[in-house]
């Protein structure tokens, strides 16, 4: 099979990549963060390339994509592609919540209720969970139905993360 050469010059691009990770990262290099480019981060992180996904999600989050903010929180909260950083994870959740994202509201509500990455505030945390539930987020409704028992929505394998540090 012959190698295809891509040439960029003042007249345009000969044989441009029109799909795949090459296009995604060329888009990022050129400051293009569209929904298709940002959604590719899911496949990248699920393939175990967390540092690469982190680069993509961070650019998309900075461009205002709340789904990418949620993914940045997940990466920081689990030490994927970087250090475990609950403060950074909570900050991404807060940004998504402030942007009006129901998942961001739910996640930041959990952060506040647990005091994970932020100062604990049960009242504000419940209020955010309630907003997410009102907006139709089923897991938020489930937490309300369990009288805000966090074990309802959190695997017990994660309990070590949420234990007090003192």
Describe these PLM feature segments.
Residues 1-28:
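Long, contiguous interaction/recruitment modules in multidomain scaffold/adaptor proteins
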Residues 14-19, 46-55, 82-92, 119-128, ...:
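Structural signature of tandem alpha-helical TPR/SEL1-like repeats
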Residues 30-59, 63:
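Alpha-helical segment of the N-proximal tetratricopeptide repeat
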Residues 37-44, 69-78, 105-114, 143-150:
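Hydrophobic face of amphipathic alpha-helices that form TPR/SEL1-like repeat modules
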Residues 65-67, 101, 137-139:
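Residue-level recognition of tetratricopeptide repeat
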Residues 133, 139-166:
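Terminal, low-structured helical/coil segments at or just beyond the last alpha-helical repeat
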